[in-house]
Amino acid sequence: MKSISIPARLLGTAFLALSLTTSCSDILDEQPRSTYDPSFFKTEKGVEGGITSMYAHLRYIYGQAYYYNSCQTGTDEATYGFSADGNFKDADLSGVGNLTASTSRSDALWGTAFSNINTANGVIENGASVGISEALVSEARFFRAFDYFLLVQTFGGVPLDMGAGELKFNINPNRVSVRNTVPEVYTKAIFPDLLKAAENLPEQPRVKGGVTKTVARLYLSKAYLTYAWWLKNPNQIPTYPECPRTDPDGHDAAWYFQQAYDVAVKAIENPGPFGLQESFWQVNAGPNDRNNEILLYADHTQEDEYYNGGSLSYGSGGAPDNFAGWMVNWNYTDARSSDGKSVLIRTAEQSYGRPWNRMAPPQGVFTHTFADKTHDSRFDGTFTTVYRGNWSTNGKTWESVSNANGMQVKEREPIFSFVAEDMDKVNYSEEAAKQNNLGAGTLPGRADWVLGLDKVSRYAYPGLWKLGPYRTDNGSGPGQPNAGSTRPYNIAKFSELYLLAAEAAVEGARTQAGKTARDLVNVLRARAGRWTYSNAEYKEVDRDFSAEMVAATPATIDINYILDERSREFFGEGYRWFDLVRTQKWNEYADTYTICGKLPEQGYNVKTDHTPKTHQRTIKPFHYLRPIPQGQLDGMEMSADEKKAYQNPGYRD
């Protein structure tokens, strides 16, 4: 199948509600250009280039680590790590920073999304007149709805008019802006676009990675579900701009929950080329990237820097690089053997990668979310818990090294492990901690240094294997571990359809035979019991605990169980803040968290402080919306009072 070729230079239009100019790159004929006159959209080539650019814009959102931080930090899945700066501490809401219009990293979404929306407006306005099929125009409809859906969840109501009228292509500078209400954004933009996309997009993608009916149905179901929760408003969270929580079309929350269920089930029953992988491990394994469970991804490649969108040898630390995987990755390279050798080398392998240590999973991730580590493969398929000696990638030819308990360890045998068993038996002696340089301990008869999962800290925690790098050009060396990941960043998965339908069913949707909330959840839980590979054991396995997983599912499923399953299935992928905000469970799930150690700035041996500490977050109702970025406010030619009114309440000082 033909692939979408996306150069580094993104076609798009710049919009911060203050200037709207057109800058395009002709993607399809692979002739890079820096600027075009807006009339270019009145040509077939221009419209096609605009559509291709919409795939490229995904790189400026997904894999962008600071935006990723805004979707994860401050939830039950992540707090700030030992090396975090203000970007991460501000998002944690635990008293070590302050989330404001200037510090919130949701700004990465605002500018990118509106630029793409205006491009989509141009494509939709001009597509038919230049002979572009509705199927192709519907790709633009999908991406316009996609961006508006992200925006309305993040900021509340946002502008539909960028200066030329609602949902019109704007080519003139515009320094004023009026925000539409949440119901207007859903009913005027998101739902109509997704309905047309679901109707007109093909079942088979026109190019590899192209959008289809299935992904349109997933986002339509999710939009219906999110809007239903907004109408229900169980905890009386305020919205902005202020408006009644009523639907302009006269439907109630129950109607939208039903629509969410029906659309998700229709997508499950009409999957096209998509489906579930045999095992959870296969979904996220680098060699299996772009598999048929992935409905949408922000693509990258190791084959060419131009089409990768960034260097193949160093990381810029900014978009369009895919560097989100660096954030939940601790300094494993600090490890030493008992004879003082550096034995864990930074490599471009999925279990290793570049350690930035900006974010850390709290202990509840390991005690609650992933409590079952024996039957449920999702713990093993999410984290790196065993770090194996790889000194040969650094040119060392040692046959073995002396390690814990004076025992010998060979290349690719465990040097260090996080353990869930025998945690009370680990000996955290001062001598061992000094030798291994990690603050780790020993267990009798084991050659690897160990740290119990009850000792997880901001410094040391299992790395997020899911987002680790994978390249085939490493040779016998470390490869290019400092480059952004050349893997695609997965955005939407077929598996989510089951949990969307299950969530709608829990909220009262009438269910079909064989597709109750429990039935739907158990499809994924049964799959989670199927092991084809063990990361910890570093080998293929053939184990089936599907029956045990299904038997352990509660007879009655509630929304908390759905949220737990969503975390087990999609941990660390950028879903969590949206999930907790949608269901208004953020306070319940994340107002406190436990992690070892004091605050880094208090001065102590971060590696050996294994004392758990519970931290309190201050999550107020206004936090359920992010602040409008300061750059947007600064660029508007409006009065101080008008700008204040434009900003979400709680962020105006």
Model region roles, listed by residue range:
Residues 152-159, 205, 223-235, 507-510:
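Short coil/turn linking the two alpha-helices of tandem helical-hairpin repeats
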Residues 2-3, 18-45, 221, 502, ...:
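Bacterial Sec-dependent N-terminal signal peptides
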Residues 2-11:
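Bacterial N-terminal signal peptides that target proteins for export
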Residues 25-86, 158, 226-436:
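An aromatic- and glycine-enriched ligand-binding surface/loop that stacks and positions planar moieties
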Residues 44-66, 83-155, 174-213, 427-489, ...:
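Conserved, well-structured interaction surfaces
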Residues 368-372, 376-527:
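C-terminal substrate/ligand-recognition segments
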Residues 24, 113, 282-349, 459-461, ...:
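Long, intrinsically disordered, low-complexity segments
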